[in-house]
């Protein structure tokens, strides 16, 4: 449930646990899932994790372009594919939906603007520290000029995007992506859950992650 969490985007906001291992995440998730009567977007769906799956039966799809064109740390992300392959995981290239999620990403800005509309209307947004062109106060202000027709049309495309991605994911068990890949925006719009796990460190010792969807 998102009850008690500060709203940013009603149709995209999601919460999830953080832990040191996937096993710990699964235990926490098992404890917090399900309706609590305070968030109408929560569905009562089954969840189980026993950690006993045979890796050789798991089909992992990946968008090759994300790995080939990773802006940084390409070697680390390609190494993930090598490790999975060595464990017997079935890797297969997949294509993403035809609809570019970037063209409807403004849905987030519009919904965030609505959530913080009182700040904008009362000029309290001027008290926020960051006031750059891409900072939230200006995002809130600019979003007020987005026509309702465009917002509705964008959500129509979003529905098609959800259908397309759901269809493609039926061909695999898990979709793997890099941090610079399209999955962050894509899953924000489509709602597919993700798990981010560590996959090494950069030259300065900062942790790197890889996303399983």
Show the residue positions of the predicted features.
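Short helix-loop capping/hinge segments that flank enzyme active sites or metal/cofactor-binding pockets
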Residues: 54-63, 106-159, 198, 202-209
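Short beta-strand->loop structural element characteristic of the AMP-binding/adenylate-forming
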Residues: 194-196
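Short hydrophobic alpha-helices that are characteristic scaffold elements of the AMP-binding
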Residues: 187-189
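Short, well-ordered beta-strand elements
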Residues: 17, 206-213
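Short glycine/threonine-rich loop-to-helix capping motif typified by GTGT followed
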Residues: 73-76, 101-112
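Acyltransferase
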Residues: 72-95, 116-127, 151, 155-172
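A short helix-breaking turn/cap at a secondary-structure junction
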Residues: 1-78, 122
